[in-house]
């Protein structure tokens, strides 16, 4: 479930597959009526067979904890079903006791931790000025101490930034302090906000799996259709899919296998003409993404030293 409008976030990560955040915001409020979001969850539950849904996840086209009624929505959703509820978060607001209390209702929380130092945090995540590294680590540590659910920390590895032995050791030291249940290593395999962002090479991956602890594993992008192929209009189904993240054309067709590849291809072409979809070329692959997403086109500013913090 997406509780905030597109790119409503207090970070502007260089690797974000939804493009740049402009402007960055740190305002907590009810961006959408909570009852509307809960009603959409109920509708989705009613339209699927038992066993179709493994998790209900508040993931957001930005930062879910910016919705000030997140805790209430989690509790209301849990009252509807026995399906576990998860929340992905950049954990920048966990220093606030009320945010920790809201997330404590979830069965699993997936915070991001991409850096072991303030300097690298600011270089990769480009946070709102009030979202300091010290607050992030303090909040995450305090949340872990009180949280009874599953804590799975996500680390996005970027070539030349946080894939060195030194950078990974700094992250590992914080992971040892926080003691998550698992560490999920992710790679920027979809179009990132900045074109110079690349996944690490073999050496960086070897360092990561060796240094980040026994609970660390590399996870790939989700490939399920999330039930969106049940929608009646192929164009709206395509928009719903690519609004979550950019997808290669073949992925869109697999996700929407209710329609023929020709029907999906024609829908993509119409959406591009109408300005509702855009083509993003990255890593030699042609991706389709949301027309609202804004991707960088230039090279990274800064010295070689800054690229290997």
Question: Which residues does each PLM region occupy?
Answer:
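Canonical Radical SAM [4Fe-4S] cluster-binding loop centered on the CxxxCxxC motif
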Residues: 2-36
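Short strand-loop junctions, especially beta-strand C-caps/beta-turns
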Residues: 2-4, 59-61, 156-158, 188, ...
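Short, basic/glycine-rich phosphate-binding loops at helix/coil junctions
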Residues: 16-21, 52-55, 116-120, 150-152
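Phosphate/pyrophosphate-binding loops at sites that engage ATP/ADP/AMP, CoA/4′-phosphopantetheine
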Residues: 43-51, 176
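Glycine-rich beta-strand-to-loop/alpha-helix junction loops that act as flexible
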Residues: 57-63, 90
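Conserved AdoMet/S-adenosylmethionine-binding subsite of the radical SAM
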Residues: 66-207
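Auxiliary Fe-S-binding modules of radical SAM enzymes
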Residues: 163-309
């Amino acid at each position: 479930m997406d509780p905030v409008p597109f790119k409503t976030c207090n970070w502007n990560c260089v690797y974000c597959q939804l493009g740049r955040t402009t402007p960055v915001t740190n305002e907590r409020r009810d961006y959408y009526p909570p009852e509307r979001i809960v009603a959409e969850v109920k509708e989705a539950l009613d339209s699927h067979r038992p066993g179709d849904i493994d998790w209900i996840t508040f993931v957001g086209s930005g930062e879910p904890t910016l919705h000030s009624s997140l805790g209430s929505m989690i509790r209301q959703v849990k009252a509807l079903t026995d399906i576990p509820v998860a929340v992905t978060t950049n954990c920048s607001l966990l220093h606030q006791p009320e945010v920790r209390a809201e997330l404590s209702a979830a069965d699993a929380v997936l915070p991001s931790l991409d850096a072991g130092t303030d300097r690298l945090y600011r270089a990769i995540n480009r946070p709102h000025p009030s979202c300091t590294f010290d607050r992030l680590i303090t909040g995450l540590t305090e949340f872990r101490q009180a949280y009874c659910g599953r804590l799975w920390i996500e680390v996005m590895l970027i070539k030349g930034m946080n894939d060195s032995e030194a950078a990974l050791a700094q992250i590992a030291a914080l992971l040892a302090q926080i003691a998550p249940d698992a560490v999920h290593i992710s790679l920027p395999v979809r179009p990132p906000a900045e074109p110079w962002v690349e996944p690490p090479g073999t050496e960086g991956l070897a360092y990561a799996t060796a240094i980040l602890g026994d609970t660390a594993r590399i996870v790939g992008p989700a490939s399920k259709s999330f039930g969106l192929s049940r929608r009646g209009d192929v164009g709206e189904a395509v928009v719903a899919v690519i609004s979550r993240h950019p997808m290669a054309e073949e992925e869109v067709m697999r996700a929407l296998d209710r329609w023929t590849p020709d029907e999906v291809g024609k829908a993509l072409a119409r959406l591009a003409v109408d300005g509702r979809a855009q083509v993003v070329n990255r890593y030699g692959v042609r991706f389709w993404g949301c027309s609202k997403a804004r991707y960088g086109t230039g090279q990274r500013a800064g010295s070689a030293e800054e690229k290997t913090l």
